Amino acid sequence: MGKTIGLTGSVATGKSTVSSMIQQAGIPLVDADIAARKVVEPGTEGLKEIVAYFGEEILLADGTLNRAKLGKIIFKDKEKREKLNEITHPRVKEYMLEARERFFRAGEELVFFDIPLLFESHLESLVDQIIVVWTTPETELKRLMERNNLTKEEALARINSQIGIDEKAKKADFVINNNESLEKTQKQVYTFIERFVKNK
C-alpha cells in the first residue's frame, strides 16, 4: 500500500498553485472539490437525495444542480447546510477512496488528496501525512482582496470562517512557505515528493 498525503491551506494561500505543481510532477492527485461536483451530477443518488429534500426548484433547466441557489439557501440555514453535508460528505469520501484505490492498484506509491477544509471536516484519518500551504495572514488577506475584488471586511469574513492558517501550519507534518517566489515554492514541493518517490 502506498502513502496518502493530504494537501490543504486556507483561502488565497496558494493551494491550487501547489496542487498544479504536484500534478505537473506526475503525481496522482484526487481533488475534493471535483469529487463534490461528481457526486451530485445528473443521474446520481446524491442529486436525487438533494432534490428530494430541497425540491425540484433547486435544479437548472438542464437538470443540473443550481449551485448558486443552493449556496444562498444553505448559507442562511444551518439545519439545511448540515443536511446537505450529510448527503454529500460520505459520497465525496467514498469517491476519493475509490480513486486512491485505483491509483494504488495501478502501481502508484504516492497519492495526494487535495482537501480545502481537511481540518474543519475532521478528515485527518484519511491521510498518512498533511501538507499545509502557508503564507502570512497579511499576504493571504491582500491576495484574497485582489483575486476576488473584495473589501477588507468581506475578505476577513471569508478567512475567519475557517481555522486560521497559522493554526493549520502547527498541525501539519510539512509546511510549504508560499510567501515568496514560485520557484522557491516549487523547490519545496519537489523536495517533499523526493522523500517518497525516488524515480520521479
From Swiss-Prot:
InterPro entries from the UniProt entry: Depp_CoAkinase, P-loop_NTPase
One GO MF term: ATP binding
GO BP terms: coenzyme A biosynthetic process
This enzyme's EC code(s): 2.7.1.24
Subcellular location: Cytoplasm
Recorded GO CC terms: cytoplasm
UniProt pathway annotation: Cofactor biosynthesis; coenzyme A biosynthesis; CoA from (R)-pantothenate: step 5/5
Main location: cytoplasm
The protein, known as: Dephospho-CoA kinase
Gene assigned in the entry: coaE
